[in-house]
Amino acid sequence: MCSVTGVLILNPHNYKEIEKKLAKILIRAEDRGRDSFGIVVIQKDGSTKSSKHVGKPSLQEEKLYGILDENSKVVIANNRAEPTTEYVRRKTENDIQPFEGERFVVTHNGIIANDMELEKKYKVSKLSRIDSSVLPPVLDRSWNGNLDSLSEILNSIRGSFALVIGDKKNPDRIFIAQNFKPVYMMYDRDLGAVFFTSLDDYFDATELDNVTKLDPYSVVMVDDKLEIRKVPLLKEKNKKRILVVASGGLDSTVAATYLVRQGHEVTLLHFNYHHKAEEKEREAVRKISEYLNVPFVEIDTDLFKIVGHSTLIKGSSGEIVKDRKGEEGAEFAHEWVPARNLIFFSVALAMAEAYGFDAIASGINLEEAGAYPDNEMEFVRMFSRLVPYAVGPNKKVEVLMPVGNLVKHEIVKLGVQIDAPLHLTWSCYEGGNKHCGKCGPCYMRKVAFEVNGLKDPVEYEA
């Protein structure tokens, strides 16, 4: 495994300071690569200079300097942790990344499982025993330097990769390609350079520095005019198969209905987790699935009964908070269930990957984000960023929040507009014959209908 590093130099007069920053990055990157390090510099005229060495850069710091000059344009570098399956007892310069072809210079983090197949397909030979060394000959043979055509070649790779690529014919630009292996970008305005590396920690950036995580499964080109172009490696679908985590309440029901009305293929996923309203929610979701004419999957779990520490679970010692006619329960997470949405999302993600769904969705919304951290839009955004590292290679599962930016009365309004089966929903934390009318969800529901001047179609206890 490796850390990949690249630099696009915009102001060559600052080459000495740029070199110092590069050296610091490579030393910090030792935790992803201790066995060797290499630097290849592409000059303004397309010629190259290189420095490759066995061992840690921190123990040979002098070899990190004296490489750049006023004509340097692009730097491609690598720190390598030699995989057990590719251990080379006596390494030569040919076994050290970056690898240099006739036109392209490549540094690679990951494993290419089909390197021998690529040799046959493109009729090339590896530059070394290392799998990564197949890439420069493949690119030399089949790539014209156009961003769009690069994605087609990369999709023939079976394995993992983060690539930083330099083009000797066009030393005014740098390319970054990745599936699930990470690459970060930092623009140093003062130095006049754009830096790339595998972890943002290696930049030693401050809060005011411009650091960006590049999207997984993308190919990016940055040129010396600071133009950035990006193309995805995975195709986007207009009509999606979506697995909706459905409780039977207002929010997830409106979310599911909205997706159905958008033309997507929706399946409802419901969890029976020994909560007090389990039977009523289960009944509601079944009726909602019939109304929307969509499949319904349910999962029974004892996990939250084992975790405990929530008044929402059957047999708990506490009671549902009903102070101030339910307003107290609406404004604070008294009925918090530890890590519930994280677990629900994780199970939904596993099922989505296994059964070929394109996305998962839920009824997470702005109203309940005021009390519950795992209803915050940021929770969904952060989980979405985690997904490429939680599913298999070349799998894409989106995380959607159709009502994420709406408050409760807006959700009710939208539900009426799209003919969502609000009359079939169950919002109450209790599992009685009717809504209790006094818990937090009941309070929010009643107020939401009142704001819209509508009669709530469900019944409440007197």
UniProtKB/Swiss-Prot annotation:
Asked if the keyword ATP-binding belongs to this entry, the reply reads: yes
Q: Which InterPro entries match?
A: GATase_2_dom, Ntn_hydrolases_N, QueC, Rossmann-like_a/b/a_fold
Q: Which residues bind Zn(2+)?
A: 428, 436, 439, 442
The set of disulfide-linked cysteines is none
List, alphabetically, the PANTHER family matched.
7-CYANO-7-DEAZAGUANINE SYNTHASE
Spell out the family assignment given in the record's similarity comment: Belongs to the QueC family.
Q: Which HAMAP family match?
A: QueC
Name the record gives this protein? 7-cyano-7-deazaguanine synthase
What organism does this protein naturally occur in? Answer: Sulfolobus acidocaldarius (strain ATCC 33909 / DSM 639 / JCM 8929 / NBRC 15157 / NCIMB 11770)
